[in-house]
Regions:
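Short glycine-rich or small-residue beta-strand-to-loop segments that form or flank ligand, phosphate
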Residues: 24-31, 60-67, 177-182
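Long, low-complexity, intrinsically disordered polar/charged segments
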Residues: 55-62, 213, 217, 221
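Structural alpha-helical scaffold elements that stabilize or flank donor/cofactor-binding regions
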Residues: 100-101
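Glycine-rich phosphate/diphosphate-binding loop of Rossmann-like nucleotide-binding domains
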Residues: 32-97, 106
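Glycine-rich phosphate/nucleotide-binding loop
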Residues: 1-12, 16-25, 104-108, 112-220
């Protein structure tokens, strides 16, 4: 059966956000509320996942907050800031939502409520941009000709925003590979999710995460 690692009360739903520089989001929706210690553990899980999947040796970990100053946010987020600062992770401080698309971190940490809102907003903005570009390019003959001139670069740009290649959203912190996908997911997404789960098993990512949680020391509380 599937269970959380020893010493871990809550697993985190993770997602790779495919922007100009992809980053890992943890938690992306599993826990609407999370205490400071859980946020610290989500950060460690996200760090290991980022190393394994994105190949970042020392991921920059940021805490999503309503300001960059250490004293910003709720009591829980201020406590989490202290725990992350005292940890051995490459913690770069708080990060505001507006900065996420610009490569300020490799791992973005938050509770599942915040993470899910951010993910859905990014998805919506992606659709908004796509529909807007199509509308502008198809407006008249001049814009259609302009669209032909930039077609290749636009395709590259849109490909960079495609999340289907990453599969689904893995549940981090449990003993077996579990990947969540939408019920209306495309064939490409389903295939990528199967490959993703198989990769977890072959590369023993779950075991590495269990070791990471077991070795995590808590100071600064």
């Amino acid at each position: 059966y599937v269970r959380c690692y020893k010493g871990l009360r809550r697993a985190a739903l993770s997602a790779i956000v495919p922007l100009s520089q992809p980053f890992v989001m943890a938690d992306a929706g599993a826990n609407p509320e999370a205490d400071a210690l859980s946020l610290l553990r989500f950060a460690k899980l996200g760090e290991i996942y980022c190393q394994a999947v994105l190949g970042v040796e020392k991921p920059r970990v940021a805490l999503i907050n309503n300001g960059t100053e250490p004293q910003k946010g709720t009591k829980i987020y201020r406590e989490a800031y202290g725990l992350l600062t005292a940890s051995d992770m490459n913690f770069v401080g708080n990060c505001e939502g507006r900065d996420l698309p610009f490569g300020v971190c490799d791992v973005a940490v938050c509770d599942g409520f915040t993470g899910n809102v951010v993910i859905k907003l990014i998805e919506g903005m992606g659709r908004f941009m796509t529909d807007g570009l199509k509308s502008v390019i198809g407006a008249n003959t001049k814009t259609k000709l302009g669209g032909l001139l930039v077609r290749g670069e636009l395709k590259k740009f849109m490909k960079g925003l495609d999340d289907t290649a990453y599969g689904g959203a893995p549940l981090l912190g449990i003993s077996k590979p579990v990947v969540k996908i939408h019920g209306n997911a495309s064939e490409k997404t389903v295939r990528s999710a199967v490959i993703q789960a198989n990769g977890f098993a072959e590369r023993k990512i779950n075991e590495k995460m269990a070791e990471g949680i077991a070795s995590l020391t808590v100071t600064g509380a």
